[in-house]
Amino acid sequence: SGILNSSFHMTIYFYKVWQPYGCFSNFSLHSIEMDNTFWSTVEHYYQAQKFLGSPDEKIIPVIHQACTPEEAAALGRCSTRQIRSDWEVAKTRIMREAVLKKFSTHSDIKEILLSTGDKLLVEDSPNDYFWGCGANKTGQNHLGQILMSVREELRILSMKAVAN
């Protein structure tokens, strides 16, 4: 819980797409290309990956074609479907790969991410204690941690590009 209790002005909270820093949300309409397939949002891709190699793999094209990220999320969260056996181990890596691709692909939001400097980025989700901070700010904030890691990677890459 200590990481989220640092001084408030050094923290950027994000959650809904239409709010400040909404491009940090996985629901933002920034497409990514992963494994030669275009996905409308990070959320579409992430939810589909839950079923790769599972008995319910047939849901992947349905998630891919979902009209909105909300629909993709609902399809991926359906508790009657069987997700891949390694999901708990793989999900953070998969999310990071998708987030890195999103910010590498779209220079406008890459600049927004880089403009946050060294500020703490926190997904202000009231009901997600893994990806976000949860209602009482004690969540693990894995999405915020991924964004900060991607920000550092992109900063290093942009400094190398300037140096060359």
Residue ranges and their predicted role:
Residues 1-9:
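N-terminal amphipathic/basic-hydrophobic helices that include classical n-h-c signal peptides
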Residues 8-164:
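Charged, low-complexity intrinsically disordered segments
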